[in-house]
Regions:
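Ligand-binding beta-strand-loop-alpha-helix segment within the catalytic cores
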Residues: 21-35, 95-168
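Short, surface-exposed, charged loop/turn segments at secondary-structure junctions
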Residues: 154, 175-197, 249-252, 546-555, ...
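Active-site beta-strand->loop->alpha-helix modules in alpha/beta enzyme cores, enriched
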Residues: 145-146, 308-385, 389-568, 574, ...
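A conserved mid-domain beta-alpha-beta active-site/ligand-binding segment of alpha/beta enzyme cores
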Residues: 580-636
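ATP/nucleoside-binding phosphotransfer catalytic cores, i.e., glycine-rich phosphate-binding loops
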Residues: 2-12, 25, 230-326
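N-terminal glycine-/serine-/threonine-rich phosphate-binding loop
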Residues: 2-70, 364-365, 372
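Glycine-rich N-terminal segment of FAD-binding domains in flavoprotein oxidoreductases
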Residues: 61-92
Length: 661
């Protein structure tokens, strides 16, 4: 069973010479916008092996030279695979940790019994699995009183100095551009100190340590301490890190992105995979730094970029514009700027359709979806019980109105995203109507009292009882059914899959299993769809979206292995959610909406009342989900309009997934 197919999706085929130049001259040209040495690996696995090579080499050199190697280690999620690789090297006798001295980069403070500890995590991940001597492991003393905190920090720095300073720092570039717990605003010369854990970093802590409530403060080595090391290796993996990697590597060093201070270090290296590097100039806009290897997507991206730079629509771009912005080779390749303009304009125009299921009895040569068969059987997979309407509510309504047989499959219950107050309101209503509806039974009254007592005694971070989770899940089911009914989806076509991996009761979910994939596979087999819509949030901050997508892709893969001929005729479209939209160079289908259709979509999203103002996982975006969706859809329409195409109120965009075989 292939459970990680989403990680193998490559929207771009990036020429190897862009990310792995063959010589120093080529590197100097390609990387002239980069202010710190940056190594791009095709995959995270390749980057992990490269980092492990450097760590092993550093250990051997320093042990041979002075009898020990002093390393500061972080415990962010990005570093974990490096530790796994180092353990493998140790077991294969490729490295010896007997003379390695370890300093903990950061530690939560103050601490209580049972509270999370980064040192415990580091011990579980690496230290206990190799031959590092206990006396060679150093961490901040969490028992220091707050009044003695300054002296405690200085004492920790003195321990580092007594060991001869740090030979190596191994850490991740955090989601906020942080190094260790040095959040935005940290000074270049900052020392070891107590720091507040900001809201963005706190969410990554919740995920890494499987917590409901993150510690508010921590002790961290400062930027100055990190830059004092002889070598710094920093890493970042995945598309969700692309924006911060660009800021750290190419933008001016700034306190707003502490990782950008790596630019000031003479022996710092940033190691990223292609996904995390996608906004670097040599990957995103290679025509600015080298002779470009043009393909249709790259051409579309370049012309959209040129329109943004000039403020002109596609068909008004001139040869002078191409020359001024370094795209003269593209114009020369096609004979003239006009020829490029026409090609790209037609290419993008053909993505627009008001018939997402295909227009019956029409020439479909230049349409994103085929005309036949009609009507089509369609499955829309929704990770949570509102992602369908948030991400593609306008498209879903069109599919229903155009008489396709539309099924909606809610992959998870979404129960942990219902607030206690919302759930308690339903209990109060049932208490008031129980006599009239014959619910005044001993069992109901017992359950009602148990729930009220549980809520009264509940503390932040406590896991909900099974009864609470069941009730919250039923609330989300009812909201989803209401929304589907509002759109005209048949009741029998609404499927609640309740995939087992989700049902842990905590933020941290289980691993995708054969049970999950079988549930999805059985549904697909029973419907035999001509179209499948699936979440394409490959940088999903929740994680659930990606796991749900992997479940669908694994099921499709198994069906193809089983020889399901009808599956070969099924087209799979990926949508994106409330966080980001597909880039213009990737969009293959764009479904427009009028003001009335956008208003209908908003009203459909509002059927999910538990996900409004008091929803637990709104993140640090102050906008509600319907506002995020509208802003995103309007921005897509505005982009099309700015390129000189038809002007719509809003648009939903899709990319076709071709099964990886």
């Amino acid at each position: 069973m292939k459970t990680n197919l989403s990680s193998q999706i490559k929207l771009d085929l990036v020429p190897k010479r862009y990310y792995a130049p063959e010589n120093k001259i080529e590197y100097a040209s390609l990387c002239r916008e980069e202010k710190v040495f940056t190594q791009i690996s095709e995959t995270a696995d390749g980057g992990v092996k490269s980092l492990a090579d450097e760590v092993v080499e550093t250990i051997k050199k320093n042990v041979e030279k002075k009898g020990k190697c002093v390393i500061a280690l972080g415990t962010g999620n990005s570093v974990l695979p490096v530790y796994t690789e180092l353990i493998s090297r140790y077991e294969n006798k490729e490295v010896d940790f007997a003379d390695v001295v370890v300093f903990n980069l950061f530690e939560f403070y103050p601490t209580e019994a049972g509270a999370p500890s980064t040192l415990d995590r580091l011990n579980n991940l690496l230290l206990s699995k190799v031959n590092i001597k206990p006396e060679n492991v150093h961490s901040f003393n969490q028992e220091v009183e707050k009044v003695d905190l300054y002296e405690g920090c200085r004492a920790y720095e003195a321990e580092i100095d007594a060991c001869g300073g740090l030979d190596l720092v191994l850490c991740e570039i955090g989601v906020a551009g942080n190094l260790a717990f040095n959040a935005p605003g940290s000074q270049f010369s900052s020392a070891c100190r107590m720091t507040l854990i900001d809201s963005v970093i706190r969410r990554s802590v919740l995920s890494a340590y499987d917590l409901e409530v993150a510690p508010a403060t921590a002790i961290t080595l400062g930027i100055g301490n990190i830059l004092a090391a002889k070598k710094v290796l920093a890493m970042a993996w995945g598309e969700n890190q692309a924006k911060i990697v660009k800021a750290a590597v190419e933008d001016k060093a700034s306190e707003t992105v502490p990782a950008s201070f790596l630019q000031m270090h003479r022996n710092a290296k940033v190691v990223v995979d292609l996904s995390a590097a996608e906004r670097l100039t040599r990957i995103c806009h290679p025509w600015l730094v080298t002779l470009c290897e043009w393909n249709n997507k790259m051409i579309r991206r370049a012309i959209a970029w040129l329109c943004e730079k000039t403020g002109k629509p596609i068909l008004k771009l001139t040869s002078n514009d191409y020359n001024e912005y370094g795209l003269n080779e593209l114009a020369a390749q096609f004979g003239s700027a006009y020829n490029v303009n026409i090609k790209v304009f037609n290419d993008i125009q053909h993505t627009i359709t008001g018939w997402p299921g295909g227009k019956p009895d029409a020439d479909d040569t230049d349409r994103p979806e085929r005309a036949k068969p009609y009507p089509k059987r369609v499955i829309v997979f929704s990770p949570h019980p509102d992602d369908d309407v948030i991400s593609m509510g306008g498209t879903l309504k069109r599919l229903v109105d155009q008489k396709h047989d539309v099924h909606v499959a809610y992959e998870t219950s979404g129960n942990i995203a219902v607030g206690d107050e919302d759930m308690f309101r339903y209990i109060l209503v049932m208490d008031q109507i129980k006599k009239e509806f014959g619910l005044d039974t001993e069992l109901y009254n017992q359950k009602s009292e148990e729930i009220k007592k549980f809520l009264a005694a509940k503390h932040p971070g406590d896991v909900d009882s099974l009864d609470l989770r069941m009730l919250k899940g039923r609330i989300r089911r009812a909201e989803a059914k209401t929304a589907c009914n509002w759109m005209g989806v048949k009741p029998e076509n609404v499927h609640h899959l309740d995939l087992p991996f989700y049902e842990t009761g905590t933020i941290k979910k289980g691993d995708l299993s054969e049970r999950d994939v079988k549930i999805v596979k059985d549904l697909i087999s029973s419907v035999k769809p001509h179209q499948i819509f699936v979440a394409g949030d490959l940088a999903d901050p929740h994680g659930t979206h990606r796991v749900c997508t992997d479940a669908v892709l694994a099921a499709i893969d198994e069906l193809l292995d089983d020889g399901a001929e009808w599956m070969k005729e099924c087209r799979i479209w990926m949508y994106r959610g409330a966080w980001a939209e597909w880039e213009i160079d990737h969009i293959e289908m764009a479904v427009p909406m009028s003001p009335e259709q956008l208003r209908f979509k908003r009203n459909t999203i509002l059927k999910h009342q538990s996900q409004m103002e008091n929803a637990p996982f709104l993140g640090d975006d102050d906008r509600l989900f319907w506002q995020r969706a509208e802003d995103r859809n309007r921005a897509t329409a505005q982009l099309y309009s700015s390129l000189g195409l038809a002007s719509y109120e809003a648009m939903e965009a899709f990319v076709e997934y071709h099964p990886i075989r």
